[in-house]
């Protein structure tokens, strides 16, 4: 493929059809005949809403009574409400433009809905489709919503040109002169249509009126009323809620949730405070930890220090030592060593001279034995003489 050539852009069939309808002022007869071909669709959902997709967007088809009867006559063993994940071919169809309440109909926008009316269709049970993307609501597409807004704006311009003429236009100069005086607020407002409130509804298109069946009626026809009630219990009557009532309920629900979360937060905070109080109660302070003997320092059983009411032993002063270092043992000089010996002998009761010898205390052991041998030798020498 050359640089200048580009791959053909794929487009949604539903988006193209519905856009053509709005661009032709809602007149289906003006839609190109090349687009009016059978539609092969994938059924995204069959109850409580019947939704079909072209792989890009989903829309809601509306079945006529004739289409449902024909389907049941040709396919008696197949239910329309059981076509989820199946493929259907819509042979005969048309498009209509309706004015609806978008707060209740989710397949609409700005109170306008383009409806796919099904006159004849059949299932294609042998074919299976695997969508490569998740389809979204066509009426939530930004580009398509812009198309609907343009349609509304064009209708509003047409209504203004039809009702407002030069004779009934307000003289702006008179309105400006009366600005400083008391007057009506709507003195400079020109009413362009008979719409009530701020919602414009004076459209010139011909609204469709083809009769169709609700999917709930088709469900009852195929499975009975009891099955419908059971299905309604499972789905809880799914509806699109909106408007002031819906907002009020949502706000009340949110406020209730905040109160419940606040109560939960208070109870959890109280539990945390109780746990902290217990820990503080049973944790000894720094002072008590100093006096409390550790396992390795616990006195032996039977000693007087372990008796109740005994005096606490006053710790003695530490022995003199050298400078502390993390790299090696204590560095002790000779003077410090002499001081250590003096301290040690004072503790035992003796005295040490500057040379390090013990004064005023007779040594025991080998020294006494040597002195005894020397005295015997001297006696023998004297006897020989």
UniProtKB/Swiss-Prot annotation:
Q: Which Pfam families match?
A: TEBP_beta
Any single GO molecular-function term of the entry would be: single-stranded telomeric DNA binding
Sequence ranges of Low complexity compositional bias? 295-304, 312-326, 365-375
| UniProt keyword annotations, A-Z | Chromosome, DNA-binding, Nucleus, Telomere
Write down any Gene Ontology CC term.
protein-containing complex
Region feature Disordered, mapped onto this chain: 231-329, 343-385
Provide the function of this protein: May function as protective capping of the single-stranded telomeric overhang. May also participate in telomere length regulation during DNA replication. Binds specifically to the T4G4-containing extension on the 3'strand and protects this region of the telomere from nuclease digestion and chemical modification.
* Stated name of the protein: Telomere-binding protein subunit beta
Q: Which organism is it from?
A: Sterkiella nova (Ciliate)
Q: Which gene encodes it?
A: MAC-41A
């Amino acid at each position: 493929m050359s640089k200048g050539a580009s791959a053909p852009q794929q487009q949604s069939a539903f988006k193209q059809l519905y856009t053509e309808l709005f661009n032709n002022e809602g007149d289906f007869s003006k839609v190109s005949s090349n687009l009016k071909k059978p539609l092969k669709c994938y059924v995204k959902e069959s109850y409580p809403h019947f939704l079909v997709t072209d792989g890009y967007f989903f829309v809601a088809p509306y079945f006529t009574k004739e289409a449902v009867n024909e389907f049941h006559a040709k396919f008696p063993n197949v239910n329309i409400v059981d076509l989820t994940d199946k493929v259907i071919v819509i042979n005969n169809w048309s498009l209509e433009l309706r004015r609806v309440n978008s707060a209740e109909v989710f397949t609409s926008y700005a109170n306008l809905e383009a409806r796919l009316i099904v006159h004849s269709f059949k299932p294609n049970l042998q074919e299976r489709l695997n969508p490569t993307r998740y389809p979204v609501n066509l009426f939530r597409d930004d580009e398509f919503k812009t198309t609907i807004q343009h349609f509304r704006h064009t209708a509003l311009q047409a209504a203004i040109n039809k009702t407002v003429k030069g004779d009934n236009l307000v003289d702006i100069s008179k309105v400006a002169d009366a600005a400083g005086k008391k007057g009506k607020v709507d003195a400079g407002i020109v009413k362009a249509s008979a719409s009530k409130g701020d919602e414009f509804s004076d459209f010139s298109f011909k609204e469709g009126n083809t009769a169709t069946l609700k999917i709930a009626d088709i469900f009852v026809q195929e499975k009975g009323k009891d099955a419908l009630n059971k299905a309604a219990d499972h789905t809880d009557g799914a509806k699109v809620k909106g408007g002031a009532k819906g907002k009020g309920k949502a706000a009340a629900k949110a406020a209730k949730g905040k109160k419940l979360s606040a109560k939960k937060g208070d109870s959890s905070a109280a539990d945390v405070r109780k746990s902290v109080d217990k820990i503080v109660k049973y944790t000894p302070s720094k002072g008590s930890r100093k006096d409390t003997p550790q396992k390795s320092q616990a006195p032996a059983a039977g000693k007087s220090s372990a008796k109740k009411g005994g005096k606490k032993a006053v710790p003695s002063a530490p022995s003199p030592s050298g400078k502390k270092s993390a790299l090696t043992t204590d560095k002790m000089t000779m003077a410090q060593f002499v001081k250590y010996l003096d301290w040690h002998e004072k503790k035992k009761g003796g005295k040490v001279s500057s040379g390090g010898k013990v004064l005023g205390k007779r040594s025991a052991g080998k020294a006494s034995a040597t002195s005894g041998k020397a005295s015997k030798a001297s006696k023998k020498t004297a006897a020989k003489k």
